[in-house]
Amino acid sequence: MHFDLIDAVVEQSPTRIVTHKHVTNAEEYLQDHFPGYPVLPGVMMLEAMVQAARRLAGPKPTPLVLGQVRALKYGAFVRPGSTLRVTVDLHKHLGGDAIEFKGEAHLLTNLRDAGEPKVAVSGRFALRPVRR
């Protein structure tokens, strides 16, 4: 099963990517999380950062998978009707083609909102080639 958590790439450079994911009631994973108060599961927020990091890393001969997560912090619920703005920076290259990233996802309840949006999730994580 694959969930595409990138609706748009709004900025990209060799070391940074910014993406948007608009969360709707149609998202299958919101059906049971939580009944009567649907919110984007925390693991899906992490997956949004991982998908952005894969896109930033570019095509590889061996697919990149999540190898490590460090200092992951959650700060806000992401409800249907909101947009998650994901920013991922390439932090450093590790041994064996692994790459460490810093990620942060902000909650945008309205793309025209003024002020600083709330941080929904932030942390460091590493992607490494899949071991077959």
For every predicted segment, state its role.
Residues M1-L40:
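Catalytic strand-loop segment that frames the active site of acyl-thioester-processing enzymes
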Residues Q31-R55, L66-G67:
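Compact, glycine-rich, soluble single-domain proteins
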Residues V23, Y74, L127-P129:
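Hydrophobic residues in beta-strands and at strand termini
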Residues V23, L56-A57, L107-T109:
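Generic helix-packing signal
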Residues V50-L90, R124:
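Hydrophobic beta-strand-centered segment that forms part of the acyl-chain substrate-binding groove
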Residues D7, E11-R16, P80, T87-R132:
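HotDog/MaoC-like acyl-thioester-processing domains
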Residues F3-D4, L66, V119:
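Residues that act as N-cap/strand-start positions at coil-to-secondary-structure junctions
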